[in-house]
């Protein structure tokens, strides 16, 4: 399997070294998705183990673990052909308007087992689906807000570190807007919605976007205050 072949076994000391190096590198250049991904993997094992156990207790979660769907062009390309009101079409519009490709995510390399590697891969690949569901942009405020939701859902240390790093890079207006409007919303939204790692999104692409939001308890992001 591709996920298994991509894995790099690390000792505890090596994990610590990769985590520290990734954290420092990500602070210097927050655009380095590979460093942020490595940080998430080397610090996130306990969190991914908890997510895995929750998925095993959920009907859709078990189906995901059994079938191992991937959010890649080959498997989700049909979303571009769905009616405008659907969740799948909204995802396609989100991706297309930004010239994003589902295939751009870096591979998981530092998880100990194939099963955990898949869970980490799934968490990484549904990121843009969550952007779509919550109506969040990909600017600094949008990404920081989604990291808060991801932390509430998965308790990944990397998510909280990313939020802290994001607030440091905010200008005064952005920081005020985030702390006053987006942070409280993101905490509430992340806690109120269903367990999003146990949702088999691909099975719901053809459903109405607003209906799936209601079904999963999604609170869309606040609009930018005037």
UniProtKB/Swiss-Prot annotation:
EC number: 4.1.1.130
Location(s), subcellular: Mitochondrion inner membrane
Gene Ontology BP annotations: ubiquinone biosynthetic process
Keywords, comma-separated and alphabetical: Lyase, Membrane, Metal-binding, Mitochondrion, Mitochondrion inner membrane, Ubiquinone biosynthesis, Zinc
Protein name, per record: Ubiquinone biosynthesis protein COQ4 homolog, mitochondrial
Residues annotated to bind Zn(2+): 127-128, 131, 143
Quaternary structure (record): Component of a multi-subunit COQ enzyme complex.
Pathway(s) served: Cofactor biosynthesis; ubiquinone biosynthesis
Organism of this sequence: Arabidopsis thaliana
Family statement drawn from the similarity comment of this UniProt entry: Belongs to the COQ4 family.
Role summary: Lyase that catalyzes the C1-decarboxylation of 4-hydroxy-3-methoxy-5-(all-trans-polyprenyl)benzoic acid into 2-methoxy-6-(all-trans-polyprenyl)phenol during ubiquinone biosynthesis.
Lineage: Eukaryota, Viridiplantae, Streptophyta, Embryophyta, Tracheophyta
Cofactor(s) needed: Zn(2+)
Keyword flag Transferase: no
Enzyme class at the top of the EC tree: lyase
Substrates-to-products reaction catalysed: a 4-hydroxy-3-methoxy-5-(all-trans-polyprenyl)benzoate + H(+) = a 2-methoxy-6-(all-trans-polyprenyl)phenol + CO2
Membrane topology term: Peripheral membrane protein
A GO cellular component entry from the record: extrinsic component of mitochondrial inner membrane
Remarks, miscellaneous: This protein may be expected to contain an N-terminal transit peptide but none has been predicted.
């Amino acid at each position: 399997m591709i996920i298994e072949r991509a894995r790099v076994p690390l000792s505890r000391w090596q994990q610590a070294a990769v985590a520290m190096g990734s954290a420092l590198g990500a602070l210097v250049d927050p655009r380095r998705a590979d460093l942020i991904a490595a940080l998430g993997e080397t610090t996130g094992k306990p969190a991914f183990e908890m997510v895995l156990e929750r998925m095993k207790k959920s009907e859709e979660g078990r189906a995901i673990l059994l079938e191992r769907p991937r959010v890649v062009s080959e498997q989700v390309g049909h979303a571009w052909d769905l009616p405008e009101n659907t969740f799948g079409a909204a995802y396609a519009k989100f991706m297309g308007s930004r010239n994003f490709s589902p295939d751009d995510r870096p591979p998981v390399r530092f998880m100990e087992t194939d099963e955990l590697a898949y869970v980490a891969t799934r968490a990484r690949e549904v990121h843009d689906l969550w952007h779509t569901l919550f109506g969040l942009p990909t600017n600094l405020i949008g990404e920081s807000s989604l990291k808060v939701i991801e932390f509430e859902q998965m308790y990944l240390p990397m998510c909280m570190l990313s939020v802290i790093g994001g607030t440091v890079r905010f200008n005064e207006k952005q920081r005020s807007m985030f702390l006053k409007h987006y942070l409280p919303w993101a905490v509430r939204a992340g806690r109120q919605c269903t367990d999003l790692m146990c949702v088999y999104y691909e099975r719901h692409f053809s459903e109405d976007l607003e209906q799936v939001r209601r079904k999963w308890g999604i609170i869309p992001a606040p609009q930018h205050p005037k």
